[in-house]
A protein has these predicted regions:
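Gly/Thr-rich phosphate-binding beta-strand-loop-beta motif of the actin/hexokinase/Hsp70
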Residues: 7-32, 120
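Nucleic-acid-processing active sites and adjacent nucleic-acid-binding tracks
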Residues: 32-68
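Short glycine-rich phosphate-binding loop at a beta-alpha junction
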Residues: 66-76
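Glycine-rich, often acidic, oxyanion-interacting loops/wings at catalytic, nucleic-acid
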Residues: 152-248
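Phosphate-backbone recognition surface of nucleic-acid-processing proteins
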Residues: 245-251, 257-345
Length: 378
């Protein structure tokens, strides 16, 4: 009987890979030297514990103390502070688009943090090995670029909140037969209005609720106006590239303050596009054909990009038809979809939105005014 001794891996590996599966309470860490894996769990946001596990993994997986380290995690609620902290530690980190991660097509699949972190490790190793299609890496904005988006996003939330207060007041009054035409009428209604037909006094608790609802509406409305004033003040007073782009976009007839602000802060300010295909794809406005066997059809746009930009561009496309009727884009739309029904025009407006977004990108990056477009004041 022969005794076979198991060989030991005594080589010093030059690279240590780390994948992170993040949750609110725990972080699952996966380490690999390309041959052997190590899985550990730490408390969420416990940075000293993370650094200690990294040093221990280097020892356990036979990696040099100063070996090159590559890591990744999925983009999510934790934002980019982890990425910035890893970079500060000298670790090359990649933040992954969750939608690009491969998943099993089985009807039922195992779903645990351990399975997920091992899958991320395999994808990271494939990506670093040259298989760039294994996953999609997202571009990270700077802290300042991230902060630039706060004003328009806060305004977006406040507008929804203001609409909810308005709808609530109208709903409360209509249950007593009173139709509210203007919100400025609420104080007068509370003072002397009576229910329709029967004419009884409005109940006291209803009046109290309406008073509080109106106060909340006025507060939100004042905050919206303050944000809009601040946006205009910054755009007119600050001589920085982002504000210059806003002013440049506003020069086109049909493009207003909010459209130019959102397009700049959410899209054009910090993203780098190499060609028009990347512009359309980032907004999720590119087509997704289905062509398999004898079946060929269009599945609509991908909707894989920035939802705010996609919604804005559809609205802006309708405004473009109204304010720039003699532009080449508007004339193209009328030739292709002008004689069609409502459904065809809705399809066409998405195509126009994609073309318009590309035209605005060329206008900002290369100074090319969209063909036939009119500038304000001309």
């Amino acid at each position: 009987m022969k005794t076979v001794l198991q060989s030991k891996d005594t080589a010093i590996h030059p690279v240590l890979y780390m994948a992170m599966e993040l949750s609110h309470k725990k972080w699952k860490l996966g380490f690999s030297n390309g041959k052997k894996n190590r899985i550990r769990t730490i408390d969420a946001r416990d940075w000293p514990a993370l650094l200690a596990e990294i040093e221990l993994a280097k020892s356990k997986l036979s990696c040099a103390i100063d070996c090159k380290m590559l890591s990744c995690y999925e983009a999510g609620r934790d934002g980019f502070w982890i990425h910035r902290a890893l970079i500060a530690e000298g670790i090359e980190n990649q933040v992954l688009d969750s939608a690009s991660i491969e998943v099993s097509r089985r009807k039922k699949q195992v779903k645990t943090d351990r399975v997920d972190v091992l899958a991320l490790l395999r994808l990271l190793i494939r990506y670093i090995g040259g298989e760039k299609q294994a996953l999609r890496v997202i571009r990270i904005p700077t802290v300042a670029e991230e902060d630039d988006r706060r004003l328009n996003r806060e305004r977006e939330r406040l507008l929804k909140e203001r609409g909810a207060h308005r709808a609530r007041m109208k709903s409360l009054l209509v249950t007593h037969g009173i139709v509210l035409e203007k919100l400025a009428e609420v104080p007068r209604i509370l003072a002397k209005a009576k229910a329709a037909v029967i004419g009884y006094e409005l109940p006291p608790d209803l009046k109290s609720e309406l008073e509080r609802e109106y106060q909340r509406y006025e507060l939100v409305n004042s905050q919206v106006r303050e944000l809009e004033r601040l946006q205009i003040e910054r755009a007119e007073s600050q001589d920085i590239p982002a504000m210059q782009k806003i002013q440049h976009l506003r020069g086109l007839k049909g493009v207003g303050w909010q459209s130019s602000w959102i397009l700049t802060m959410e899209f054009f300010n910090w993203r780098e596009f190499k060609n028009s295909k990347q512009v359309g794809a980032c907004a999720g406005l590119t087509p997704t054909p289905y062509d398999s066997g004898d079946k060929t059809r269009e599945q609509g746009i991908s909707k894989a990009g920035n939802k705010r930009i996609r919604q804005l561009m559809v609205e802006l496309a309708w405004l473009w038809l109204r304010y720039q009727p003699d532009s080449d884009l508007s004339l193209w739309f009328e030739r292709r979809f002008g004689s069609g029904g409502k459904r065809m025009r809705r399809i066409g407006i998405v195509a126009l939105a994609r073309k318009l977004l590309v035209a605005l990108w060329r206008y900002l990056e290369h100074g090319v005014i969209p063909q036939g477009a009119v500038l304000k004041g001309v």
